[in-house]
UniProtKB/Swiss-Prot annotation:
Subcellular localization, as worded in the UniProt entry: Host nucleus, Host nucleolus; Host cytoplasm
UniProt KW keywords: Host cytoplasm, Host nucleus, mRNA transport, RNA-binding, Transport
Biased composition annotated in UniProt, kind: Basic residues: 34-47
Domains: entry comment: The RNA-binding motif binds to the RRE, a stem-and-loop structure present in incompletely spliced viral pre-mRNAs. This region also contains the NLS which mediates nuclear localization. These overlapping functions prevent Rev bound to RRE from undesirable return to the nucleus. When Rev binds the RRE, the NLS becomes masked while the NES remains accessible.
Disulfide pairings: none
Pfam entry (one): REV
Name this protein carries in UniProt: Protein Rev
Cross-referenced InterPro entries: REV_protein
Length: 105
């Protein structure tokens, strides 16, 4: 009956996480605009901490996420880079770079 043991483990983990989320209720709407904004900002900061803690609990209690399948990476010794073609220079392009056209007379 290994399935029941896994179910009990999952239910226990969900209870722990529910208690964790219940410990950080959404702030009330009373007070000035600035006070409400500050309470919501602090609540969001705590909520991010609760989210991180809940994911760590899930990872520890349930064995963590499954690893992705192994991807074949090509051999880096076969990697080569082709040289870039030189762009054709135009007179307006040279003037934009601050060079003067040469007068060979």
């Amino acid at each position: 009956m290994a399935g029941r043991e896994e179910d009990a483990n999952l239910l226990y983990t969900v209870r722990i996480i529910k208690i964790l989320y219940d410990s950080n209720p959404y702030p009330s709407g009373a007070g000035s605009r600035t006070a409400r904004r500050n309470r919501r900002r602090r609540w969001r900061q705590r909520q991010h901490q609760v989210d991180a803690l809940a994911s760590r609990i899930l990872q520890y209690r349930l064995g963590g996420p499954q690893e992705p399948p192994h991807l074949d990476i090509p051999d880096l010794s076969k990697l080569h880079l082709d040289p870039l073609d030189q762009p054709a220079s135009t007179e307006t392009g040279d003037n934009q770079l601050g060079t003067q056209p040469s007068n060979s007379a």
